[in-house]
Structure formats: C-alpha cells, structure tokens
Amino acid sequence: MSNQLIYSGKAKDIYETADDGIVLISYKDQVTMLNGAHKEMIEGKGSLNNQISALIFDRLNRVGVSTHFIKQLSETEQLNKRVAIIPLEVVLRNVAAGSFSKRFGVKEGQALDEPIIELYYKNDALDDPFINDEHVSFLKLATDEQIAYIKQETHRINAYLKEWFASVGLTLVDFKLEFGFDKEGMLILADEFSPDNCRLWDNAGRHMDKDVFRRQLGSLTQAYETVLERLRALDQ
C-alpha cells in the first residue's frame, strides 16, 4: 500500500489519499478489551467489521444522517471523509448491560423506559472517564449547541437502527458513536458502527457482539458473520 499511514489504532489504520479531505480506512483483525490491555488476532474479524460498518453507514447516509462514509473499496478497506474527531464517546443504552448494570445495580437485560445517553471523555491515559455536559463545557470539547445536536442525532440514529435490527431478529442493546468535523467544518458522524462498538442480542438472548470475545462465549467471527448475513439479506 503506497498511501502514507496517518494513524494506527486498536482496530483500524488510517491512510492519506491524493485528496486531503479523504482518508482510506483499513480494518484490522485485532480484537481488544480492557481499553486495549488485552489483544488478540482473529482472522476475518477486520473484513466483517468493515463490511458491517459500510452497510450501516450507507443506510444512515440514505436516510439523511450526515456521516464520513463515502464507499467501501474492498473487504477490509473503505474511503471516508477526513474528520477532526471530538474526543467524546457517545453511548446510547436501550437495555441495561455491561458497565451500566454494574454501575447502577440494574439487572442485565432490563429494558430501559427511555433510551439513555452517556458521555465519556475519550482519553486512554484517564481510562475514558464518564462525564456530563458541564464537564464537556469546562474541557472545551464541544459547545452546548454541538452537544445538543449530537444527542439529537444519536437518538435519531437509534430510532432508525433499532427498528432495522429488530426486523432481522436482533435487539440493539447499546452502542457507542463518535462525531467530528469534516473539511468544511460540518459536524458529522464518524468512526464505525459494528459489533465491536455495539451490543446486539438475538431473539434467544445470544450475544452477537464483542461480548462473545470478552466473555469467551464461542466464535466471534461466527457471530459477526450472522449479523452481516441478516443485515445484507434485508438490504437486497
């Protein structure tokens, strides 16, 4: 690959292209947990995440959500708009699970009365602390108007994807989003949407996401392949 590497992350590498407003994203087979403290290579995982994320972002583009996604290039690569990421992880929860259940003593699997949005400061050295709007303002991560827009878009994305996943027998338990500014200064959805950064349960309650790896529940790629097959079948 002749493109110059800009950034190497836990799950993706980012490369320059001839257009300074566009980057090439290459998905890795690496899977991590505990904020990258534990790593493994699982063959085929990068390809599955790339294809799932491309499918979902294409859908979101078509329903009017502004995203960084341009097109899928290969099984492991896609073109995206270059984005200056806001260092915030925006988590939306529909069902109690994971850290939410532990933090608030809520039984895993309990449906929430309304979707709940949580904000986390994206900072590996601080272990991505849980913060609120006032912290965001103090740290000058985003303006009040930008946070309001991010939350509005997150709820809109949730409403659409929750219905789409339900139509293929999957419950969208929770997910993490990242937003940033493109070359023109527009605030758009970025990063990825895959079973690496969301929780999906099938109608039998089986995990179809990275919890398969975290909890050693079976084959991660088999779970991801099932998600891709179901979404692809409905998209045709």
Curated annotation (Swiss-Prot):
Any one GO MF term held by the record is: ATP binding
In the record, the note on similarity to other proteins reads: Belongs to the SAICAR synthetase family.
- Its Enzyme Commission number? 6.3.2.6
- Where is the signal peptide, in residue numbers? none
Protein name as annotated: Phosphoribosylaminoimidazole-succinocarboxamide synthase
Q: Is Ligase tagged as a keyword?
A: yes
Under InterPro entries, the record lists: SAICAR_synt/ADE2_N, SAICAR_synt_PurC, SAICAR_synth, SAICAR_synthetase, SAICAR_synthetase_CS
List, alphabetically, the Pfam families matched: SAICAR_synt (PF01259)
